[in-house]
């Protein structure tokens, strides 16, 4: 296909136009008074949401060059979402501010490579400062505050996540389900999560989120490699008759068998997903046995004289729900408490008997996975559209609280970044010179952008508020919900340090890449063939004949 090649300032300006479009559509959602965005869907009802990364994923422009700018800034949001699970809108606003200021300097003749060095050095300095200022989370009240802010100031959601963390522990699994009522409810049930995702992305049932969700599936557990599909055929035929989904957990599934499963899945013959068993050697077998106890099934192993080709439905485990993404598998089981309790006691005895610290550690991990259970939040709402929005907010809140437990919290509402602007200014003035200093100043100017946008979305003058906040003590900031200046930590307006740090790092990275762009190669737009578009002679174009 023919390509279009654009150089220099023209290339950077085309990227900037795409970045402007994406940043503006995402930035309207920032802060407690941020607005919603409606996404038109080809099938089904439109989606009304407040989640930065979901909006970013939806935007595709007609102009290929501008679309490249959209894709770049979308990456800043996606990477922040992958690392911290929240803060995607902040990352987008920061990246946009850095790109705008940087392009002005490049147009004025500054060296883009040296500017990028300055941006990178300033970012490294700020990351250290954010980590220094982070306060560890000490109680469930702070967890609730974090969840509340991430869920768009929904206190009920924040409190529910704090309760869930109390019940399953800070490392515990919190899963989301669509509820059947108007109320959002919390339930703790047996279950486990392990660090293995689907073997093939073709198993995903939700292609937007790249997740496989199986409701009330059968679970086939085996410690052998599945090489031939013939081994699976008898059990697959039995399951196909029931119409239920199937999860296969095996040491590995080789190409031929995997291809057959994928083809059956895509044709709709059988809703199946396959994951590799976690762990290695004896530990793998022990973990598979734990899963068998949890799901009320049997581990099909030749050590016990069981073969795959002879497997029957009563050997398979069952669960309420299984959610699989590219990295993890979460099994939500129920009604098997006594067996799980007995298995936990057995693991505790093994821990008492072993002298090896390593073995103790691994047994402790197994015990935590089995005994911890899964907190299931059943999302309730009046309509499907509201439920989808609520689910995304809850997901942000869960991710934010986990990030806060990991790296601590900092004052929220854009306050931390705004206060750090003066620190980076004095550090850069003494440590950098020339165009590197200009690069650091670009970062400094961008640091107030999230606070300004939060204030503007609340109907206030962003520039005035940003200057006012910078002159106040470190923890003081602007509460956009009430329009007052408050101590952010006391008011419970906090952000996880990890979210703030990830957003800044990803924004700087993308800004540096855009500034150092000198040429873009993109597809030429396809010419639409006018002649072939018309209807046959004398026939109206609106009817099927």
Curated annotation (Swiss-Prot):
Molecular-function GO term, any one: unfolded protein binding
Q: Which domain of life is it from?
A: Bacteria
One of its GO biological process terms is: protein refolding
Record's catalysed reaction(s): ATP + H2O + a folded polypeptide = ADP + phosphate + an unfolded polypeptide
* E.C. number(s) listed in UniProt: 5.6.1.7
The record, for SUPFAM superfamilies, names:
GroEL apical domain-like (SSF52029), GroEL equatorial domain-like (SSF48592)
Which residues does the annotation say bind ATP? 29-32, 86-90, 413, 479-481, 495
According to its UniProt record, what is one Pfam family this protein matches? Cpn60_TCP1
Q: Name one GO cellular component term.
A: cytoplasm
Similarity-based family: Belongs to the chaperonin (HSP60) family.
Name it: Chaperonin GroEL 2
Q: Which organism is it from?
A: Prochlorococcus marinus (strain SARG / CCMP1375 / SS120)
Q: What is the lineage of its organism?
A: Bacteria, Bacillati, Cyanobacteriota, Cyanophyceae, Synechococcales
